[in-house]
């Protein structure tokens, strides 16, 4: 395994491996059948591991001993049972509280240890979302105040936030599009026909999310340059990781302004 870091001048320096694999777990080893396109994994404070087995429409819960603990493929809500459909994101706070981004069912659900639905977020309404908005959650995270953060499909405005009652509260972490001076120059002098064929400058999508104990949101996004692919968002939605201006992006201790 190759492990490296950067020195003061931005040059690669190879280092001893910080982490190496200790073992592997598969659906076959667990006795529940092979995983099919798993899209997320999460752990709780008790050492349980939660796998979003997306292609099999289920969540697999693995105990601290790496043995199968339970499978969640259906949930109970208001006396009715419904099946999960392409669950793609998870956030676990122990067996008593698990959030699932149930993507193809267009909902985020909170379930207890008996697979009973405690809370559902679906079809949020707001003027800022638009009449044609389709809620397809992909990733989910929850902070200490029970605020729910959701990465949704085809949402470029940022991460959707919901209050403790599941009501839409707005966006956070919106990524501003950076246009180079050369691009601005050509856009200014191009014809209408040329502009219609030019690249659309829309923000990139977020791809992953996690929250630390202090309430900071860590989010990854599709950054082709790799300069801001990981962001650390404060409660105001500002990225507080040092940006790549005179130093390397990713430094938590020194933020350049």
Where do the language-model regions lie?
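Eukaryotic scaffold repeat domains enriched in small/polar residues
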Residues: 1-257
């Amino acid at each position: 395994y190759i492990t490296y870091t950067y020195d003061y001048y931005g040059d690669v320096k190879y280092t001893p491996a910080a982490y190496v694999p200790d073992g592997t777990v598969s659906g076959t080893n667990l006795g529940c059948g092979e995983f099919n396109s798993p899209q997320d994994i999460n752990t709780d404070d008790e050492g349980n591991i939660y796998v979003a087995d997306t292609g099999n429409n289920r969540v697999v819960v693995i105990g601290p001993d790496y043995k199968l603990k339970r499978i969640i493929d259906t949930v109970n809500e208001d006396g009715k049972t419904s099946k999960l459909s392409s669950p793609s994101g998870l956030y676990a706070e122990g067996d008593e509280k698990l959030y699932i981004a149930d993507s193809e069912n267009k909902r985020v659900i909170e379930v207890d240890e008996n697979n009973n639905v405690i809370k559902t977020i679906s079809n949020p309404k707001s003027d800022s979302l638009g009449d044609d908005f389709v809620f397809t959650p992909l990733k989910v995270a929850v902070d200490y105040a029970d605020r729910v953060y959701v990465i949704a499909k085809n949402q470029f405005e940022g991460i959707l936030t919901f209050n403790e009652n599941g009501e839409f509260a707005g966006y956070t972490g919106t990524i501003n599009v950076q246009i180079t001076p050369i691009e601005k120059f050509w856009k200014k002098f191009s014809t209408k026909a040329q502009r219609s064929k030019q690249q659309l400058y829309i923000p990139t999508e977020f791809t992953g999310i996690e929250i630390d104990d202090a309430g900071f949101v860590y989010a990854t996004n599709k950054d082709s340059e790799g300069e801001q692919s990981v962001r650390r968002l404060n409660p105001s939605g500002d990225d507080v990781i040092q940006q790549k201006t005179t130093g390397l992006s990713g430094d938590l201790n020194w933020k350049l302004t």
